[in-house]
A protein has these predicted regions:
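Conserved Radical SAM active-site core
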Residues: 2-18, 22-25, 52, 56-184
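Conserved N-terminal beta1-alpha1 strand-loop-helix module at the mouth
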Residues: 38-43, 47-52, 128
Length: 184
């Protein structure tokens, strides 16, 4: 059996699942705004780490392709590079205070190692408590019968953390969760 080796910044903090920790940038309650489940109440868990660099979202088609940019040493789009040059990642204390960008990956603080310190590192129990605290009625099925979905997003939510997802989904406080979407 060959085990996939991930860059250290994306690997779980500990491979012993009883003490392993999940790195995530944020969790929040909102209404799903994309895909088949538009309009459904949802809790989003945005994990840290991504093996892609989607620099060209929102840019004109005349912009050089990502591979061309990387060959010439460009690893961030201009907006992210501008933030790094301004050293905002060193002077801002909270993930929530980082500016929204309009080109490239909009979750830059969830993918680039330079922003890793903004992310939480939590046990499965701690993540579950955080998710439950975000539910309007503290449970995955509301009193009116409406299910609240869990949206696993990122970064790339299927990168290294999947070993912890079984423990997360089998947690006793997650037993009423019926719908999970992975945004990759």
């Amino acid at each position: 059996m060959v085990e996939e080796q991930l860059p250290l910044e994306f690997a779980p903090a500990n491979t012993n699942t009883k003490q392993a920790k999940l790195r995530y940038s944020e969790a929040f309650y909102s209404v799903q705004g994309e895909g088949k489940f538009v309009g459904v109440p949802s809790v989003f868990l945005r994990t840290f780490g991504c093996n892609f660099r989607c620099m060209n979202f929102g840019l004109d088609r005349s912009e050089p392709m990502r591979d061309e940019k990387q060959k010439s040493g460009i690893i961030h789009n201009q907006e992210v590079q501008g933030l790094l040059d301004s050293e905002i990642h060193k002077t801002t204390n909270r993930f929530e205070d980082l500016p929204i960008i309009h080109t490239g990956c909009d979750t830059y603080a969830s993918i680039y190692p330079e922003f890793k310190h903004f992310n939480r590192l939590a046990t499965v129990d701690e993540v579950v408590e955080h998710l439950i605290s975000l539910l309007p009625e503290g449970k995955w099925t509301m009193d009116n019968g409406q299910d609240v979905h869990l949206i696993m997003t990122g970064g790339e939510p299927l990168l290294a953390w999947q070993r912890l997802y079984i423990e997360l989904f089998e947690h006793p406080k997650m037993k009423d969760l019926k719908n999970v979407t992975f945004e990759t």
